[in-house]
């Protein structure tokens, strides 16, 4: 943990033709979460990630969701990954490796992470339904690809059930 007034936090703004994104993250926060992307299930995913990680997370995205959610989800994920990398800084005092197996209702997920500085993703899941509400589930892997690329982490995710 940082000493004194040092905080592991970052603010990233990303603007493209299709979207405008603001991500603020404080790894030493208290679990305050505010996520608004215009894509409800993606908001839920990011909110749960922040909540269960115990950090503060603010995400404000406006995008061309009237066309589809691809650009909004991609640009937000890239900005989140960059903010995570910046907040981790030199990673002093942080264990390099971590893993968990978590049941989420009907879903069982196993994840392992390496804060190596080298982006790499393995994402395995069984056949999925195309939509959860209005969310295009084919974007799931792309979310993680985008986060991994900017966070510069190695991540293995296996959806074992559900």
Could you describe each region identified by the protein language model?
Residues 5-162:
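Structural preference for solvent-exposed beta-strand-turn elements
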